[in-house]
Amino acid sequence: MELLTTIIVCLLAGCGAGLGTGFAGMSAAAVITPMLVTFLGIPAYSAVGIALASDVLASAVSSYTYGKNKNLDIKNGSIMMVFVLIFTVVGSYVAGLLPDKTMGSFSVVMTMFLGIKFIVNPVMTTKEAMQSVDAKKRVVQSIFSGAMIGFICGFVGAGGGMMMLLILTSVLGYELKTAVGTSVFIMTFTALTGSVSHFLIDGDTPDFLVLSLCIIFTLIFARIGARIANKASTKSLNRATGAILIILGVVVLGANYIK
């Protein structure tokens, strides 16, 4: 019975996290962490490490799908990624010094806020408009944005997907598909750095079964989500992304309430 419960929880967590990653560039940690803590009793800091590890392959396969459809900006994304990686380690260390509850609430609020934003105020920027932004200005913005996102990534226990999506669309002026593609590309590396940092700082060996199941299920559903997202129109993608984020936000909020 305990094994069945573990499989079901990991399946649901992986499904939500994978679709969120592939469809909206959301970090798997925003969904997986509270699910593991609430229903399997895994310590929050260890759950964050498992969630970030699940993020790595899910983000990688999603970024490959977006890149194949020419919805990925590797050049500018790489600049942001360097600073994200540096500050991810700092944020991860600070997170280990704080209570569990401090780590969980931010992701939920950010997820629901972005969900509402995409429905009420959809991102309709075109690739042409995106490319017209001054290159030097974008480099400076990427550096400061990367530092902030990296710290939040390590601190909250998320790949920084929601923060990156918000900044890429609202601050750097990316069109939605390219923003999601670039976000998951960066998140592949931030999640890898964050998960290794969490496991090293935590010192305990994570539950291998839970880790394996979360990685597999998240990867499968991320692939499905990314393929659907790349075929959708911008208007439909905004609505679908908003709906998914709000639903996942409510589910995670419910999990936290049960806890």
Task: Name each model-derived stretch.
Residues G18, V48-V56, V180-A191, L245:
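Transmembrane helix-bundle signature of multi-pass membrane transporters/permeases
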Residues T33, A53, L57, M112, ...:
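Alpha-helical transmembrane segments of polytopic integral membrane proteins
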Residues I42-I50, K75-I79, G173-V184:
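Membrane-interface alpha-helices at helix entry/exit sites of multi-pass transporters
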Residues S54, T182-F199, L209-F221:
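A small-residue-rich subset of transmembrane alpha-helices
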